[in-house]
Amino acid sequence: MGRRDGTGGAGVKGGMGAAGGAGGNAYLFGSGGAGGQGGMGAAGADGVNPTPTGTADAGSTGTDQTLGGNAIGGNGGPGDAGDAMTSGGAGGSGGNAVSTVNGDAVGGEGGKGGEGAYGGAGGAGGSAASIGNAAIGGNGGAGGNAQAPGGVGGAGGEGGDAQVGTNSPSNAEAGNGGSGGNGFDSFASGGTGGAGGTGGAGGRGGLLIGDGGAGGAGGVGGTGGSGAPGGGGGAGGDGGAANTDSAGSSRKAFGGDGGVGGDGASALGTGGEGGIGGQGGNGGAGGLLIGNGGAGGVGGTAGAGGTGGSGGAGGAGGAGGGGTNSGPGAAFGGNGNTGGNGGNGGAPGALGGKGGSGGLIGRAGSDGGVGAGGAGGAGGAGGTGGEGGTGGDGKTTDGNPGMGGSPGSAGQPGQPG
């Protein structure tokens, strides 16, 4: 979970690997035992985005209106704004309008979603129905933008439906869907991997005659944690449906356009650095009279860098509403955004252990080699583009399908140690 101030948290460093056991010592004659290999360091924790702890109040609902003349539904109120740990409130729905004689009917607009840790959803537009004149559905409210690291944008509200009667000379125009809110960038990086454990020392050769045992290899460093992902964009609202009771040339039904999907956000935190390799154990000493010293253990390989956080996905475009005479316009998916950069590889491995001293007749053991550097972490994946909304069906002219959003770019790989 992220910190209470809404900043999210970098991953914590992994624990160090256990040291290898020492080799046994020979008594008067014989070779010393080899030291054990050091344990692997623990992986660093992944970076985390904050988790909202509450939601602000929703906006008020617009009032419905039914009149013999012009009828206009009330607009929905905007959702209250949240803060770094509180999501925005949902927008209120627009009021419905019904004209029972020869007036126009206009549905109320949906309220905008509040901005906050996560964006609030937009309110739906009010529906409109007129017996003898035009009917215009209310537009859906826009989703609120996210304002905390890794937060997701709110979904757009649906457009209101529209219906005109058989005796009406006017058109039915449904409301458009609201646009989705944008996601917010993430910043938390992955934690550093833990250091590998030290290799165990080789055992001493026999007091008089015997070779010293080889030192154990150092443990491998832990892998760095992944960066936190960027926030996704909210989906666009669907357009409302329009309908006329008969398909006369003077009466056309226009389905509402789907809303534009919100943009996904970038992951700016890097993957954590790989842990350093453990130091190789020292070789055991040879016997006092005859015996070679044990070789020092090789240093452990450094851990690989963590993967950069992935970019947030773009929100899907809303579907166009259907119409009995004419379809809607196009809906566009939101663009994906850029993935975070990969973390750097761990530092070169620790120094190898020292070779043991030789006996009166015998040579000293060779020193252990230096451990290899860790591999660079992979770049974070780019966010996927949102899908375009489908065109609504029309009995004479179908609506056009929307275009999909563009995918985000992948992050750059980290440097090797």
Report each predicted region and the residues it spans:
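Glycine-centric low-complexity repeats
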Residues: 1-417
